[in-house]
């Protein structure tokens, strides 16, 4: 890939935790990859850019408000998006939900024709918004998000139900109302009903497919 500006198209998918962002991103990636090939499309989760907390104790890490913009290393994410757009590869961080910090390993990611970026706080940062070619907000009722989050965090991330509920009441819901929901105004497309909205996914596929022509 050359250094031609904006050759890498960035598509942002935001919304509440457990709203269906990852499902939409993975569905779009899988179905478009089958059409154009793995070398032309990739996915970057915002969760990979939670700040490194290896200098903190486990007790301190647990107290971090992971739903506040300050928990994210958006400076690094912004830098990586600029690198990809200028034709340079990046080392994508990996985050451990059980250790509450970054892993030592990274994933080498070459520039792609299209990068799908998904995460809860993407649209809160003007720099990230300006790097996106277009953005999507997945608008799912909070009670549904809570049920999905409890199932996911208990089954996949080793959390207890009590800790998930306590975190939801203390930070997840308040931060959604303060930061995430207001960022919906910056989205180009709002998708209701989450990742199982097949009509919305087909419309998004058609839109993204234009970048491969």
Curated annotation (Swiss-Prot):
Leading EC class: transferase
Chief place where the protein resides: cytoplasm
Catalyzed chemical reaction(s): uridine + ATP = UMP + ADP + H(+); cytidine + ATP = CMP + ADP + H(+)
Pathway: Pyrimidine metabolism; CTP biosynthesis via salvage pathway; CTP from cytidine: step 1/3; Pyrimidine metabolism; UMP biosynthesis via salvage pathway; UMP from uridine: step 1/1
GO molecular function: ATP binding; cytidine kinase activity; uridine kinase activity
HAMAP family, sorted: Uridine_kinase (MF_00551)
UniProt name for this protein: Uridine kinase
Gene coding for it: udk
């Amino acid at each position: 890939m050359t250094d031609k500006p904006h050759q890498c198209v960035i598509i942002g998918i935001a919304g509440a935790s457990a709203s269906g962002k990852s499902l939409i991103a993975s569905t779009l990636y899988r179905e478009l990859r089958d059409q154009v090939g793995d070398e032309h499309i990739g996915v970057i989760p915002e969760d990979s850019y939670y700040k490194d907390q290896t200098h903190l104790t486990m007790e301190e890490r647990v107290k971090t408000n992971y739903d506040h913009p300050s928990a994210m290393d958006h400076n690094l994410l912004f830098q990586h998006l600029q690198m990809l757009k200028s034709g340079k590869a990046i080392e994508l961080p990996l985050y451990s939900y059980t250790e509450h910090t970054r892993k030592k390993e990274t994933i080498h990611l070459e520039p792609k024709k299209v990068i799908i970026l998904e995460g809860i706080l993407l649209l809160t940062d003007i720099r990230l918004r300006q790097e996106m070619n277009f953005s999507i907000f997945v608008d799912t009722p909070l009670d549904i998000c809570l049920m999905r989050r409890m199932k996911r965090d208990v089954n996949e991330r080793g959390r207890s139900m009590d800790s998930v509920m306590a975190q939801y009441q203390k930070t997840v819901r308040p931060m959604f109302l303060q930061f995430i929901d207001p960022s919906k105004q910056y989205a180009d497309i709002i998708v209701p009903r989450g990742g199982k909205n097949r009509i919305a996914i087909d419309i998004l596929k058609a839109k993204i497919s234009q970048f491969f022509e």
